[in-house]
Amino acid sequence: MNAYRLLFFLTLLNLLNFVDRQLIASFSNFIVPDLGLTNAQYGFLTTIPFIVFYSIAGLFMGVLADMVNRPRLIAFGVVLWSVFTALTGAAKGFISMALPRMFIGVGESILTPTSMSLLSDSFPSKKMGFAAGFYYMGVPIGVGVSLLIAGYLGESLGWRNCFYLLGGIGLLLGLSALLFKDRPRKNANSAEEQPTLSKESTVEIVKTLYKAISASSALRFTILAGVFYHIVLGASGFEQLWLVQERGFERSNIAQIVGWIGVFAGMTGNLVGGILSDWWQENTDQGRPMFLFWLALLTLPIGIYYRFVEPDSFIFWIGIVIGYFQLGCFFGPTFSTVQELVPDRIRATVVAFYILTLNLIGLTIGSWGGGLCADWMEAANYQEPYTMMLVVFSVISIISIPCYYLAGKRYKQDKIVLGKVFNE
């Protein structure tokens, strides 16, 4: 029961994590005109200041999480990002919004590597797909709740007050993390065997990570698939601008509608992705990424076609639902896979490295590149620049499909090979 209580609390923190992270995108139809931002500036704000600090700090935080008291580390991270979320509400322009995003990135970089390490020490391996899927239910629900806040409170409270409010909520939740105790780490049964913070142990963890990535094609292809999938996720930060400017919706109304879709479709995807990927791995000779291969292959046509249809079309709404469902399905299978392909002592580090590649490469290309692309298309007098940009980046993300296939195909062979490499 304690493991499930921990899982619920960490999922709640992850939900807040993505509410705060997504606020700029959810309030894009409020913030962009208020601050007079270009598409490139908006795309930059949603990624570069946050992602660079989030990704690089996350790698160090992953190493740190393998060595120190994890609930205390989580508490520090949540408090840090919440303070700067509140300060974002006072932004007067591009620079004053970019600066707090850097510190939000540092704070949020702590949560997932540390949480996944805690969960791996709390649940057996065969339930990690479920545990990771449940934890990552915070992603689509957080994105959806962020949109609901914009839709229901944006006009009445204003976007600035919403940032202040969420910062205060985060402070309370962050301090609550101190009520939890750290859990014994697997394969470390005594105080002497518990990892400690030192230069030598840090170097050894990094060497072990490099050795695992070099030895496992399944691990490499899982990481690569995630990067290409995150390119279209980065571009989707322009979704609300697309819906209002090129599909004619009212900004508050469409934020409410898509917010509810995100909550329920994403939550369903998390549960389905976690449970079915666990079943797939247990009952076939393939790894969890093969489940994502079939999911991506089957949903691809609608994922592109719905961009071109009228908003009163049934296909249009099915496309939005599938997008959030697929987002929900992604996290449980992939994060379980990357953790299971490395030694127990570097689980938090590999999660942090995976997050670094997803965000620093995938999201940055999708969001900032998407903004530059949309600005160029507007200057070239394209009739629907957001539509064309989103389609282009959706096509690029197709490369993730063969990567999922190869990762799923190689998973069980690589698991055996890595066991021999690390003598486990």
Sequence positions of predicted segments:
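Extracellular/periplasmic helix-loop-helix junction of adjacent transmembrane segments
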Residues: 27-56
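Conserved MFS/SLC helix-loop-helix module at the cytosolic interface between two early adjacent transmembrane helices
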Residues: 56-92
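Helix-loop-helix hairpin linking two adjacent transmembrane segments in secondary transporters
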Residues: 135-185
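Juxtamembrane intracellular "pre-TM" segments in multi-pass secondary transporters
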Residues: 184-222, 246, 424
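Cytoplasmic helix-loop-helix junction between adjacent transmembrane helices
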Residues: 100-140
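Extracytoplasmic gate region of multi-pass secondary transporters
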Residues: 24-25, 216-271, 327-331, 335, ...
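Multi-pass alpha-helical transporter architecture, strongest
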Residues: 176-181, 300-308, 391-424
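Helix-breaking motifs and short loop linkers at transmembrane-helix boundaries and internal kinks
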Residues: 36, 69, 90-96, 124, ...
